[in-house]
Amino acid sequence: MPPHTLLLRPKLLFTTLAALALGACSPPQAKDPQADASAAIANQVILPTYTRWVEADRQLAISALAFCAATADLATARADFLHAQKAWAALQPLLIGPLAEGNRAWSVQFWPDKKNLVGRQVEALISTGQAIDAQSLSTASVVVQGLSAYEYILFDSKPELADATRKASYCPLLVAIGERQQHLAEDILAGWTGTDGVLAQMSKFPNQRYADSHEAIAEVLRVQVTALDTLKKKLGTPMGRQTKGMPQPYQAEAWRSQSSLNSLQASMLAAQSVWLGVDDKGLRSLLPADQKALAEQIDAAYVAALRALDANDRSLTALLADPAGKPLLDDIYARLDSVHRLHQNELAKALNIQLGFNANDGD
């Protein structure tokens, strides 16, 4: 062994021991429960929901092609649409990142539609006889790009009565919407999972989006509060709460497919998943021990709202047309309102979050 190697060894040993000693004296890394919750919600709740949405839209694109090629029937096409719509509804409390920017959500679903723009613009586009594909559709009005237009074609254009010529006139748009939704969903997911995407930004701080974990948790809660408020509007508007009690069934989110309440339930389940988290790593985990009563109150509010929705097997349209349906809808609305107010007031205060204005203010 060379002599100089022996001479260096004591110095190396001293350096190593010094480093270990300094490490032992350094304070342990402080725990950050908000960072843990943010990362858990992003990875275990939000990302899987976005992934399911992408998968549903891929199937929607396949379904449109199959229906138009007459290798799948109308019932199958409608079932695939309802699956995609349910996957979209589950995203409502999770609109963080690319989908919440640039009005992209309008390209997925156009609601509210107070003037039947969906039906009018679909028919106007079809009547032009122009070639339609996903590329041209991406620059068209958002009214005809998304699920609302797809729903119109499958449920309101009388496809079951259409002859081959009429079906052929709608099919290019149906196929284009399916492809457009698939591409949009895949782009949004890429914005989540890419380098420095939202997933990374909600998992490690600071970054370009969040100065710290508290900002991330604050956005999660703000999105929750806005979504819950929107759910109240989606139920309250057709109930007539903004029109002096006069029901407005055609203002329901999915009146054509009679699936408005199913979408509402999917959104509520997603909101509850953010609250509870996976392995108890949701917003609930951030409440201190002295807020146990509030945690249990929010738990109970979610259970009551979901139970009220689950106990009903009638469509929103049917309930609005039946005087006996009013107390049932009033009960569901009151329970949604309870969940919303608990988040907006008590939970925000307990987590020291200033909510400010939400996206629905001024509606």
Model-identified regions with their sequence ranges:
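Bacterial N-terminal signal peptides that target proteins for export
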Residues: 2-14
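Bacterial signal peptide processing site
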Residues: 26-29
